[in-house]
Amino acid sequence: MSDADGLATYEYIANHIGSCEEDMDFLIDNMARVDLTGQFVISAARYLFAIDNGRFADAIGRLVQLGIDKDRERRYLGAMMEQFYGADYAARADELSAADDNFRRIYKRLFPASAM
């Protein structure tokens, strides 16, 4: 598959969700190579989270880590916070940070002046 920025791979995942689970590592590796901004790795993480957070937990974890590293301008990370952690994530930041390294990394990226 030819993919310049991750969109084609994201679309493939969305259109073949029932049959691409065995290829997920390859698909994520491809997105890691071509998605320079994190837009599509974060979109894929959000999509898989909405489909079945438990079933796709490993893939979601990898995609989130890639998104944290790639979204330097913080354009896409914020969209995940409420979906993944609930509307009250800011009030529970200390608790969530202690339990989830990805949360801590995203929160620090979004709110660098935070005392956390």
Model regions and ranges:
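Solenoid-like repeat scaffolds
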Residues: M1-S2, D29-L36, L63-K70, L96-F103
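Alpha-helix initiation and capping sites
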Residues: D3-L7, I17-D25, V34-G38
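Structural detector for internal amphipathic alpha-helices that build alpha-solenoid repeat scaffolds
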Residues: D5-G18, V41-I51, R72-F84, I106-A115
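Amphipathic alpha-helical scaffolding segments comprising HEAT/armadillo-like alpha-solenoid repeats
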Residues: S19-M31, N53-Q65, A87-L96
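Ampipathic, surface-exposed secondary-structure segments
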Residues: D35-I68
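Eukaryotic acidic, Ser/Thr-rich intrinsically disordered low-complexity regions
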Residues: A87-M116
